[in-house]
């Protein structure tokens, strides 16, 4: 790590701590040349591989934009969308791979979105899963009702 003050090509780590709820590492460094201290924050880069094969950095903002479209006209606030985007990023990072197919990002959105707002979930799922008929919607609604019934039965 180059010193930002004197550009010396080496530095010594004085202290390391987790930051951003474990998503990053904050390191306090010291330059052996000029003696000044500086802080670095290290994060693992997460990339999304699109269907076309193009790779782009994971973007919470892009997740929020897509989900916001599905939530249009619904009572969903920005804090809930930010939390959902964080849950999606956590789920994708938990896969342990630096590159994740865009399909897996979509799958990671579905669960938290279903919990957040069922109508928005249906809108998102209809595009993501390419619904082509009313039967596709009916099948998804039936699955949602069955899951709700199972959850109610286990809560008793």
Curated annotation (Swiss-Prot):
Can the keyword Zinc be found in this entry's annotation? yes
What does the entry give for GO biological process? negative regulation of DNA-templated transcription
Instruction: Copy out the cofactor comment.
Output: Binds 1 zinc ion.
Any keyword Ribosomal protein? no
- What is a single Pfam family found in this protein's UniProt entry? Zn_ribbon_NrdR
Where the record annotates domain ATP-cone, the positions are 46-136
Going by the entry's taxonomy, the superkingdom of the source organism is recorded as Bacteria
Q: Which cofactor does it need?
A: Zn(2+)
Gene Ontology terms, MF aspect: ATP binding; DNA binding; zinc ion binding
unnamed zinc fingers: which residues?
A: 3-34
Protein keywords: ATP-binding, DNA-binding, Metal-binding, Nucleotide-binding, Repressor, Transcription, Transcription regulation, Zinc, Zinc-finger
Give the matching HAMAP family: NrdR (MF_00440)
Q: In which family does this protein belong, per the annotation?
A: Belongs to the NrdR family.
Function field: Negatively regulates transcription of bacterial ribonucleotide reductase nrd genes and operons by binding to NrdR-boxes.
Q: What is this protein called?
A: Transcriptional repressor NrdR
What is the originating organism of this protein? Nocardia farcinica (strain IFM 10152)
């Amino acid at each position: 790590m180059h010193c930002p003050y004197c550009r010396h090509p080496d530095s010594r780590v004085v202290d390391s701590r987790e930051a951003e709820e474990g998503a990053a590492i904050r390191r306090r460094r010291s330059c052996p040349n000029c003696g000044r201290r500086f802080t670095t924050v290290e994060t693992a880069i997460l990339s999304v591989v699109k269907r076309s094969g193009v790779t782009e950095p994971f973007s919470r903002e892009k997740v929020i934009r897509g989900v916001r479209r599905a939530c249009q006209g619904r009572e969903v606030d920005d804090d809930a969308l930010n939390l959902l985007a964080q849950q999606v990023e956590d789920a994708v990072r938990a896969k342990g791979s630096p590159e994740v197919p865009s399909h897996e990002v979509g799958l990671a959105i579905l669960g938290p979105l279903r919990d957040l707002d069922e109508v928005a979930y249906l809108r998102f799922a209809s595009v993501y899963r390419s619904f082509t008929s009313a039967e596709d919607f009916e099948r998804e609604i039936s699955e949602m009702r069955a899951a709700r019934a199972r959850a109610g039965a286990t809560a008793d």
